[in-house]
Amino acid sequence: MVEWTDEERTIINDIFSTLDYEEIGRKSLCRCLIVYPWTQRYFGAFGNLYNAETIMANPLIAAHGTKILHGLDRALKNMDDIKNTYAELSLLHSDKLHVDPDNFRLLADCLTVVIAAKMGPAFTVDTQVAVQKFLSVVVSALGRQYH
């Protein structure tokens, strides 16, 4: 089980309570698909992903990015039991969607970059430690059901 300090809980909740999920979700997923183009293979049904401009303008990508950020709300509300909170989602991604679990880490890294860019100098070392710890636990939970 992960141990959270009061400071980490506060940092994480403060950050996510101020995020515009539509903006941050879209930017994070778009960044992942552009920087790591092999991740696009899971989004074939989302239409044209020909280049960065089409990815950034794709409403299905934007909507899925928002959905991902809202999915993190479950982890925020269950910080002491993230692994069990994401058990079904892990099964979906492993058994039905066959997503390479390393892609969760890539997306988490992109989300960290987008949050840091949004926060600017307020994204301190302590903030980064808390955000990366939180996202690492989420990534671990999503990869838990893989064989």
Swiss-Prot record:
Role this protein plays: Involved in oxygen transport from gills to the various peripheral tissues.
Gene name per UniProt: hbb2
Entry GO terms, CC: blood microparticle; haptoglobin-hemoglobin complex; hemoglobin complex
Signal sequence, renumbered to the chain: none
The UniProt record lists the keyword Amino-acid biosynthesis: no
A Pfam family per the record: Globin
Presence of the UniProt keyword Heme in the record: yes
Domain named Globin: residues: 3-147
Protein name listed in UniProt: Hemoglobin subunit beta-2
Distribution of this protein across tissues and organs: Red blood cells.
General remark: Hb 3 displays a Bohr effect, which is enhanced by organophosphates, and a Root effect, which is enhanced by ATP.
Lineage, top ranks: Eukaryota, Metazoa, Chordata, Craniata, Vertebrata
Cross-referenced InterPro entries: Globin, Globin-like_sf, Globin/Proto, Hemoglobin_b, Hemoglobin_oxygen_transport
Top-rank taxon: Eukaryota
GO terms under biological process: hydrogen peroxide catabolic process
Family classification: Belongs to the globin family.
Quaternary structure and partners: Hb 2 is a heterotetramer of two alpha-2 and two beta-2 chains. Hb 3 is a heterotetramer of two alpha-1 and two beta-2 chains.
Cystine crosslinks: none
Alphabetized UniProt keyword annotations: Heme, Iron, Metal-binding, Oxygen transport, Transport
Binding site for heme b: H64, H93
Gene Ontology MF terms in the entry: haptoglobin binding; heme binding; metal ion binding; organic acid binding; oxygen binding; oxygen carrier activity; peroxidase activity
